[in-house]
């Protein structure tokens, strides 16, 4: 049996018992999204993107992405709305439980983005979206 620990939390876009497990893949731009789709490995990855206005993830959502994590944004953002429409678990404005860095609107958030990306990229995680407000990112070891 896998051991699980909560590594990060954020805003939950919608409540669901569906808890996808996959390897986190940071997608900084449309080229990275296209490359992942063309690799045939889309359904093995939880997608990590910078913001809730990241519309270039739309092709991945329509082709069967299993889960999304963002570093900023809110459930009311474009990506939050799309995740609900496609019923793809999505946790937004993720922050690490063991770090003081947080996203702050209007601030330079590069340190926060780098910390979360470094901690999650390449890790096998489960998205727990059972709570209506808070989504939990669980490290699966």
Predicted regions mapped to residue ranges:
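Non-catalytic, soluble scaffold/interaction modules
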Residues: 1-72, 76-141
């Amino acid at each position: 049996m896998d051991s699980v620990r909560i590594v990060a939390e954020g805003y939950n876009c919608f409540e669901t018992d569906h808890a996808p497990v996959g390897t986190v893949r940071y997608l900084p731009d449309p080229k990275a999204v296209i490359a992942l789709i063309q690799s045939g490995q889309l359904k093995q990855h939880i997608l990590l993107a910078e913001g809730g206005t990241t519309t270039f993830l739309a092709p991945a959502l329509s082709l069967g992405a299993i889960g999304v994590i963002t570093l900023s944004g809110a459930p009311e953002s474009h990506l939050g709305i799309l995740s609900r429409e496609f019923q793809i678990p999505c946790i937004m404005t993720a922050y690490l439980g063991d770090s003081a860095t947080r996203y702050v609107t209007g601030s330079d958030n590069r340190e926060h983005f780098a910390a979360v990306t470094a901690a999650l990229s390449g890790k096998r995680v489960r998205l727990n979206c059972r709570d209506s407000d808070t989504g939990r990112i669980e490290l699966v070891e």
